[in-house]
Curated annotation (Swiss-Prot):
Its EC number(s): 2.7.7.41
Species for this entry: Staphylococcus epidermidis (strain ATCC 35984 / DSM 28319 / BCRC 17069 / CCUG 31568 / BM 3577 / RP62A)
Protein name per its UniProtKB record: Phosphatidate cytidylyltransferase
Organism lineage: Bacteria, Bacillati, Bacillota, Bacilli, Bacillales
Listed GO biological process terms: CDP-diacylglycerol biosynthetic process
Membrane topology recorded in Swiss-Prot or TrEMBL: Multi-pass membrane protein
């Protein structure tokens, strides 16, 4: 418990100033977190990060995370670059004489999309304003807190025992219920540019998909037989263990709220 608490304090002391500052430093921080998260995923599948497919995946990740407002050249690089990376990774299945399988290639490409899109929207959301990233973080935090409390007090029906045996249906809906507090309170202080009823609906959707993101990462770990995605955060696991919900919440937040 002491290690877990100390890790959380140190992480917050590093993370919060960068989040508040935003801009280039946050974007570079997002790239760093994404590369670590990609390494964690590849390690689960016994693919070394410092290997040909690992390094190609890392390059593809950087390409997919390039800022969208940098100009048309970014979209050109992303399209042509990702097509080229896909062909190279697929070709390596032959060059490696099937030691690197087609399933491994598909896993690399899926990992790049999963991690890259999630962390790209991390800094893109912050660039739209601190209120939006705060909105996302509070939804995820209150959902997790509510799911834990309701699950402990009332949880009797397992949500998905094969993937995450501790999660319950009562906790799932308890998390959604607690997340509703976020827009109700935030609208008193900041303008989120949406009717409160629509905002409540968006919050419910984000809470549901945040929990789904948690289950997806749990599914990865269960499939590959690992307890945590990594060990970079003592007592907390890896980067993916901390950001799994945001992989789903942040892209959806941009689609449903920011880009509307």
């Amino acid at each position: 418990m002491k290690v877990r608490t100390l890790t959380a304090i140190i992480a917050l002391l590093i993370f919060l100033p960068i989040l508040l500052k935003g801009g280039l430093i946050l974007m570079l921080f997002a790239f760093l977190l994404a590369l670590i998260a990609l390494k964690e995923l590849l390690n689960m599948n016994m693919i070394k990060f410092l290997s040909i497919p690992g390094l190609i995946s890392a390059l593809a990740l950087i390409i997919i995370m390039l800022p969208q407002d940098a100009g048309e050249w970014v979209q050109v690089i992303q399209l042509k670059g990702l097509i080229a990376m896909s062909f190279i990774v697929l070709s390596y299945t032959v060059l490696s004489k099937n030691r690197f399988s087609f399933m491994d290639a598909a896993f690399c490409l899926m990992s790049v999309a999963y991690v890259g899109i999630g962390f790209m929207y991390f800094y893109e959301t912050r660039s739209e304003g601190l209120r939006y990233i705060l909105f996302a973080f509070l939804i995820v935090w209150l959902t997790d807190t509510g799911a834990y409390i309701f699950g402990r007090l009332m949880g009797k029906h397992k949500l998905w025992p094969v993937i995450s045996p501790n999660k319950t249906i009562e906790g799932f809906f308890g998390g959604i219920l607690c997340s509703i507090l976020v827009p109700l309170v935030m609208q008193m202080f900041v303008d989120l540019h949406m009717n409160i009823w629509l905002l409540l609906l968006v919050t419910i959707v984000l809470s549901m998909f945040g929990q789904l993101g948690d289950l997806v990462e749990s599914g990865f770990k269960r499939h590959f037989g690992v307890k945590d995605s990594g060990r970079i955060l003592p007592g907390h696991g890896g980067i993916l263990d901390r950001f799994d919900s945001f992989m789903f919440v942040l892209p959806l937040l941009n689609i449903l709220l920011i880009q509307t």
